[in-house]
């Protein structure tokens, strides 16, 4: 079994826990998630299995979509409801429209200080482990981008919003910063990931449903193929001979490409090499594609 299973992660499990459950259910040795989702969060968690794990570095998960709910009046050390309150403030003087204006202003390119309770590492040690000992270390601010943000509802002190943002954005930190700007503190109470790159809730299933489908031998409908997951890459179809050549680790010749499909591809284009719709390799095109027989593509990853 090769590809991706999109899990609708439940509250309380770590991303590692989910991968372990998938590995056990599918009896797969090779499995891994494409990006951590906080234990208190729910929603889209793509898990690669088999040859799908080779595709992870080449996925386009540059855009993620979340629905979040924050509560005004308290900031916590984790920036969510699982932490300890470190600051409390009065929100009762705030008008819904002023809250809407502030929350809606968190769009565009923003500078964000990663939270101490995160998986980022300092000298090889995850920051959350240092935070649990009471230590706080300097972190570099990071540029993130919020492509869009819509306030769904305001029922003070609760505010629910949906946002589309760049990879690496901490929605917890956005909520914290919103609370600071409003002067009363805030933290997340709910976070649900609606999509991550090509993976969305429409394809997501629960761990319980995964077990049912596995026992029935009916996983084909929920398995996202590596080719579909890499659909953002230019497709280059190979002949049978070309696919065999690539599987042996050799770049294809012009004759190995079907119907002259390799012509006109700009240098630096990342490609998925296909045979009968199945990914054989990921490669980069070099300057002057097909200017010679064997050095027009640089193979990055070959799939079995």
Swiss-Prot record:
Top EC category: isomerase
Keywords for the protein's UniProt record, in alphabetical order: Isomerase, tRNA processing
Gene Ontology molecular function terms on file: pseudouridine synthase activity; RNA binding; tRNA pseudouridine(55) synthase activity
Entry-linked InterPro entries: PsdUridine_synth_cat_dom_sf (IPR020103), PsdUridine_synth_N (IPR002501), tRNA_psdUridine_synth_TruB (IPR014780), TruB_C (IPR032819)
GO biological process: mRNA pseudouridine synthesis; tRNA modification; tRNA pseudouridine synthesis
Catalyzed chemical reaction(s): uridine(55) in tRNA = pseudouridine(55) in tRNA
Function (record text): Responsible for synthesis of pseudouridine from uracil-55 in the psi GC loop of transfer RNAs.
PANTHER family: PSEUDOURIDYLATE SYNTHASE TRUB1, TRNA-PSEUDOURIDINE SYNTHASE
Protein name, UniProt field: tRNA pseudouridine synthase B
Organism ancestry: Bacteria, Pseudomonadati, Thermodesulfobacteriota, Desulfuromonadia, Geobacterales
Gene behind the chain: truB
